């Protein structure tokens, strides 16, 4: 296999998978093992085994590659659909680095997510990775609206949402809900994030992300 693609040097020990005609670079196989032969545990605690994505449309875009430290150093940013190969927990960590005053503070965001997963386990007794995946599935919208212009008049029409955008919106709303909960609130943000994940996984309307999904789908249904 060539070590370049589109004239760009690939990372060492990488391989290329193709989605149609689109090359997707993956640095190492998904069945990577540690020295003792066991799959890596997220944060040294949580197993990726038996984690199920119940929405078939999202399975292809949720990366559940076993990792201890979810940090890819931006190596997929220059590849089309590269974020489909970023561990899904890292995408959550990256979105916790907003707004601008938190930009670049990845270690802080990492600790927030790590503590939030501990709280999720204490509250539910379930694998927090599975709770997180269920939260994504329950908050990913299936319809949204777009504006079209016909005869000089703008109309709002309902359209289906692509799987990648469904995932992007779900992650955005989950992190927005955690920040909104912790604003002017003595409750720490990791506890707010844990509450948001638990509520979203249960499809509870108390979840900010669930309410946003229902609102968007209601507007889209009225625009059919």
Curated annotation (Swiss-Prot):
Q: Which keywords does this Swiss-Prot/TrEMBL entry list?
A: Ribonucleoprotein, Ribosomal protein, RNA-binding, rRNA-binding
Highest taxon, organism lineage: Archaea
Q: Gene3D superfamilies of this UniProt entry?
A: Ribosomal protein S7 domain (1.10.455.10)
One Pfam family cited in the UniProt record for this chain: Ribosomal_S7
Gene Ontology biological-process annotations: translation
Query: Could you tell me which InterPro entries the record lists for this protein?
Result: Ribosomal_uS7, Ribosomal_uS7_arc, Ribosomal_uS7_CS, Ribosomal_uS7_dom, Ribosomal_uS7_dom_sf, Ribosomal_uS7_euk/arc
Q: GO molecular function: any one?
A: rRNA binding
Task: Say what the protein does.
Answer: One of the primary rRNA binding proteins, it binds directly to 16S rRNA where it nucleates assembly of the head domain of the 30S subunit. Is located at the subunit interface close to the decoding center.
Q: How does it assemble?
A: Part of the 30S ribosomal subunit.
Protein name in UniProt: Small ribosomal subunit protein uS7
From what organism does this protein derive?
Pyrobaculum neutrophilum (strain DSM 2338 / JCM 9278 / NBRC 100436 / V24Sta) (Thermoproteus neutrophilus)
Q: Which gene encodes it?
A: rps7
């Amino acid at each position: 296999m060539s070590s370049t693609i589109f004239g760009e040097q690939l990372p060492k020990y990488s391989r290329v998978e193709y989605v149609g005609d689109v090359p997707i670079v993956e640095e190492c196989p998904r069945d990577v093992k540690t020295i003792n032969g066991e799959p890596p545990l997220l944060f040294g605690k949580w197993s990726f085994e038996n984690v199920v994505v119940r929405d078939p449309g999202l399975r292809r875009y949720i990366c559940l590659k076993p990792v201890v430290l979810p940090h890819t150093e931006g190596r997929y940013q220059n590849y089309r659909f590269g974020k489909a190969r970023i561990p899904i927990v890292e995408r959550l960590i990256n979105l916790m680095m907003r707004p601008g005053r938190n930009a670049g503070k990845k270690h802080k965001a990492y600790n927030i997510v790590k503590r939030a997963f501990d709280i999720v386990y204490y509250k539910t007794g379930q694998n927090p990775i599975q709770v997180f995946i269920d939260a994504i599935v329950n908050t990913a919208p299936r319809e949204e609206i777009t504006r079209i212009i016909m005869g000089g008049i703008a109309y709002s029409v309902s359209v289906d949402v692509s799987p990648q955008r469904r995932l992007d919106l779900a992650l955005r709303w989950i992190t927005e809900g955690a920040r909104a909960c912790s604003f002017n609130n003595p409750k720490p943000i990791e506890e707010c994030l844990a509450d948001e994940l638990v509520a979203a996984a249960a499809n509870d309307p108390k979840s900010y992300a669930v309410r946003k999904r229902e609102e968007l789908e209601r507007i889209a249904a009225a625009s059919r």
